[in-house]
Amino acid sequence: MSLDKKFEDLFLNVSIKAALSSYHFVGKKDKIAADKSAVDAMRNKLNEIEMRGKVVIGEGELDEAPMLYIGETLGTMSGPELDIAVDPLEGTNFAANNQPGALSVIAVAEKSNLFSAPETYMNKISANVPSQGIIDLDYSVKKNISNLADYKNKQPNELSACILDRPRHKKIIEELRNLKVNLKLISDGDVSGALLVSDKKYNIDIFMGIGGGPEGVLAASALDAFDCFFQGRFIFDNENDVNRAKKMGIDDLNKKYLLNEIITGDSIFCATGITNGDIVSGIKIEENNYISETLITHKSTNLKKIIKSKNKIDE
């Protein structure tokens, strides 16, 4: 089965409305208000859609989040059963401080086709390569770079890698620098970071490192439409993380998840820019309109494009 084409516009609208709502808080130094505004707008729009939706990636578990929590049902409760993964405001600090990279993100798949990830860290690696064997979480940094360079018929110093700029990545960053790999260090936003491998125009050959598990699922949802390779392994820092994972049905705590184990079947992904970023531009005002850009993918229709939208300010 596949998702009806009508859902492209419906979920595009959801992403845009969440982005527009949080835009009012850009630069106001209040990341909580910016996030809440995006959450409220996204939830309201989702509840208008003729579907039986269930949140599998959201703002946390029921005891942590009043809205868009894991397991929450959304929609009119008629129509197809869908899994929904959301990050109404990726880059809360970016929005609060008017820095590049704030996004509103949603991914949708048919029921039971989207992995419900625990709120924990995930070690990730992705590249625009066709299959296993070229890069792998269990390979050394040197082997991953060497294999990727061979596959792309390049020298290691011609490759570019994207990684979150965190103390935990100090050793990896040093190894990449020793190999003369070009580095793009990002301060936050590992959904958009992973997406940079999707198209050669972004000039990023590999994304690697430890970031959020839910963000890994969202990134995989988009990369699936681009036939990219993605692999992730959850990292559990304490017993509470382990118990949460087991409660969600994760028995093998050391398992490496491939893209087709995170998302299967058809899917739609939307990411709307709030502030300027590498993938999409931020919201601008022209005359009496908000102008926004959204990356949208729909796997079954082979839709992969950036859509520019216009919304009247008084809407």
Question: Which role fits each region the language model picked out?
Answer:
Residues 79-90, 94-115:
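DPxDG-like acidic metal-binding loop motif
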Residues 55-59, 84-86, 95-97, 116-117, ...:
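General beta-strand structural signal in soluble alpha/beta enzymes
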Residues 176-183, 191, 195-197, 204:
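Glycine-rich ThDP/TPP pyrophosphate-binding loop and its adjacent helix/strand module
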